[in-house]
């Protein structure tokens, strides 16, 4: 069944106001909500809500009712989202993805790497994370900022999947990285991708559910912790994750729907971390915290 995007094309300021309105309307329901910049020079942004086709009628009715009272001149537009599974899609269909200075590409696109690119080679396979999903791309952008601007001597990639984020950290800076996942297939795939990218000596991969492994005490505490999983486990693990963060360290979290962001921020603020920034990509958010 197709996914539908209902959106309003407007200015950045109004897009953020509409986003707040949509968040109030849908609360903790599983509808992705977000804003996207379309044209920087002309200040064109889109505020969007995503749903499956079967939910469109009721979502449209609720959005139109909310807009009518708060933004009567707003025009609600519609787009059908192509049904694409990037993990199992054929290699020929996967285009290189740029996120900050990173270029994530498959083995079939090596010739597209340009001078100055930080290239990460990941082929589609059994483990999630090829750079095409908004959560992965958002993490890559924040990783680039954090490693460039802060003192980072070691890192943890929790829920590593394909290993793309661990590889990104290691390619930015020569430091030890621990990459863990609950799924042994993902751990094996991550190790293979680490070797493929020529940095096997700098990344340790381990199969571990949550923080239940001696690897965390052996390699931590960490100056940087990245966890691109889901909002509920992130909220549940907030105290444990914060306990493994070194003084002055940074945390990058994703796998979070826009409507879920406030609960995640509250959980990590409660763990005495400071919210630094939130970035948006296609209805998903990536949140950066630090320990003051």
UniProtKB/Swiss-Prot annotation:
One MF annotation (Gene Ontology) recorded for this entry: protein-lysine N-methyltransferase activity
Subcellular location: Cytoplasm
Binding site for S-adenosyl-L-methionine: 136, 159, 181, 228
Parts forming coiled coils: none
E.C. number(s) listed in UniProt: 2.1.1.-
Organism placement in taxonomy: Bacteria, Pseudomonadati, Pseudomonadota, Alphaproteobacteria, Hyphomicrobiales
Naturally occurring in which organism (per UniProt): Rhizobium etli (strain ATCC 51251 / DSM 11541 / JCM 21823 / NBRC 15573 / CFN 42)
Gene Ontology BP terms: methylation
Keyword Transferase (UniProt): yes
GO cellular component: a single term: cytoplasm
Signal sequence, renumbered to the chain: none
Protein family membership: Belongs to the methyltransferase superfamily. PrmA family.
Catalytic activity: L-lysyl-[protein] + 3 S-adenosyl-L-methionine = N(6),N(6),N(6)-trimethyl-L-lysyl-[protein] + 3 S-adenosyl-L-homocysteine + 3 H(+)
Name this protein carries in UniProt: Ribosomal protein L11 methyltransferase
Annotated HAMAP family: Methyltr_PrmA (MF_00735)
Family matches, as SUPFAM superfamilies: S-adenosyl-L-methionine-dependent methyltransferases
One Pfam family recorded for the sequence: PrmA
InterPro entries: Ribosomal_L11_MeTrfase_PrmA, Ribosomal_PrmA_MeTrfase, SAM-dependent_MTases_sf
CDD domains: AdoMet_MTases
Keyword vocabulary terms for this entry: Cytoplasm, Methyltransferase, S-adenosyl-L-methionine, Transferase
Chain's role: Methylates ribosomal protein L11.
